[in-house]
Amino acid sequence: YFPTDMRFHFNGHNLVAYGRQGEDYLVSDPVIETAVTCLAGDLRRARFAKGPFAPRGLVYYPEHVPADPDLKAATRDAIHQTAKRMTGLPIPFFGVRGIRSLATRLERWPEKLGTEQARKWVSSVVRMQEEIGTGGAGFRFMYAAFLQEAAELLKMPVLEEVARDLTATGDRWRDFAVQGAQLVKNKRDDSEAYAKLAAVLRECADREQEIFTRLKSIV
């Protein structure tokens, strides 16, 4: 069901199979705007695709759905866990440390890789965050919307303030994507453009360090 121009090998994709009609599965896919159907054989091929980080048929499913879930406790725990992971992981590939690490690496790409390869890598970063969904502005907007709902559920107006700050940070992530796309299209040897991109990333990291540290103290 993927359009031809969106077909490329990526083993980190997730989707929801919510029903079945004969040999077709009813699927909700995050990159497709409407529900779609997928033949059992096609879905099986995708689930057992080869390559790096092969999914090996991995499936998540609920074993028990409580009749009256404690959404307040779950929301608090979710916020705390996200804030902890964004600010406290020791590995410099995730969270705020990961953002700063990317900024440092990106700034060196022209010298290390050459301008042509550096542009390709910037293009890959922008595509990953804007189209594939591994970060960037969209995730910040989504999480800000979640915080707005959490503010109402938990009766904590302060979460509305944090949501506004995170939305503003999402705007800066979108600026990064736009500037990155312009760099790729210009095809000029402009090391200053890479420094500017890195500066936007560091600004986003600083903002998110403050935002998620604040969230840890709130919940």
Where does each model-flagged region fall?
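Residue-level detector of alpha-helix boundaries and kinks
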Residues: 2, 124-125, 193
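Charged, long alpha-helical assembly modules
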Residues: 128-219
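Noncatalytic regulatory segments and standalone regulatory/sensor domains
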Residues: 20-134
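Active-site-adjacent substructure of cysteine-protease-like catalytic cores
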Residues: 1-29, 219
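Generic detector of ordered, mature protein regions
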Residues: 3-6, 38-40, 51, 56, ...
